[in-house]
Amino acid sequence: MSKGARIKRAVVFTVSAAFAATMLTGCSQGGGDSAAGGDVTLEFAQWWEPELSDGALRGLMDDFEAANPGITVDLLSGPYASTKEQLFAGAAAGTMSDVVGLDGAWISDFAKQGALADLGPLLSDAGFDESQLSSTVVVDGETAMVPVVNFVYPLFTNDALLSEAGVSAPPSTRSEFESAAKAITALGDNTSGWVLPLSSDAPNGIQNDVMSWVWASGGSMLDDGKPDLTNDAVTSAVDYIAQLDADGVIAPGAATMKEQDKVEEFTNGRVGMMIDSLSHIATIRESNPDLTFSISAIPAEDGFSGERGIPFASWGIGVSASSEHPAEAAKLVSFLMSADTNSELSTLANAFPGNTASTPDFSDSDPLYQEAFDIYSAGYPANEFVGLPVAEQLMRDFDEQLQAALNGDQSVDEALEKSQEAWLGEF
């Protein structure tokens, strides 16, 4: 992510050219077909339909078909894991569905296979203005994926624990967070200020719980798409986390803790603060109806006044390079990214829109969703792992060195230098 991009509301995530493959020509044909008379059937493979209310996505497809006579959409829906397997098999065989739901972590692999079409010219030809998009994933100058809706990771705070510790409001700066974490931990009874999952089996804590401190102050772990882990922004954030660990305010067991463990610790009232996905709000409410909690932006460095980055995960979308019907596929992408449809889809998903002109209606939802949308609107979506080569391994490499630093086996500077070397090897 370039610094220029971070200043704007629209954020472009770029991937190193070394891992961007030239789009293949002469691919075998994708799943859509044409009937006599020129009618077109588009296959749309995704995991979204099962995660929405019954008939919600089909209803949007019906609206699209009504507005585009001659185009029919065949939804190929399944759980996330099976959709991933299906898409990777289709990419390898050149039979990927016309339109595909995407996770940003898959993009590097698909790009190396030349499996995704460049959405830039396709959307332009469809009459869609890319400047409306809150973010895009760009591989070697080509738009490989557009995030349709985003699920953000703000700071969750236990209202009762903060109040008991004498903290009047969720912390907004690093110094306020450290003070709050110390005050909560001082309550005793096995209570900790913050929870940090660092299990190497599921190393996404590096993305969501560590690098989020960098992004919250407008920093970056990349320079022109390449690793830059020894810069001041990353060093400052990791030094800060190391200080929190030295203060004894991080919940025990961080080295083996996974995201679900983190959520359980917070839900059971054993920690005062955590960084987590909005998707867990309903689960927390159901598991502990008596727990009162708030959400807020991740604290920034003291004195920082710019836009704050907030971690996110997306339902992304792309078009197969092997589709027989790229123009029609682009129409479907344009429809989903249009202001009105994107507002409706983000409302249905309790997520945030990928179109900057869209506004979800959370009037019938948990009020925290509206608060989260206000946080999201005031900052920018930040996840520099999207599209990187072997993103999970990069997190694991960093995790290993960070744990060694927290254990006192090396300094933070040494941990970052070794992580930088490991990442350069992967790139």
Residue locations for each model-derived region?
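Conserved N-terminal structural module of periplasmic/extracytoplasmic solute-binding proteins
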Residues: S2-S108, P289, D302-F304, E328, ...
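Short, solvent-exposed loop/beta-turn-alpha elements that line the ligand-binding surface or hinge
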Residues: A117-S131, G193-N204, A216-S236, R285-N288, ...
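C-terminal capping/gating helix-and-loop segments adjacent to ligand/active sites or protein-protein/ligand interfaces
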Residues: G354, E371-A422
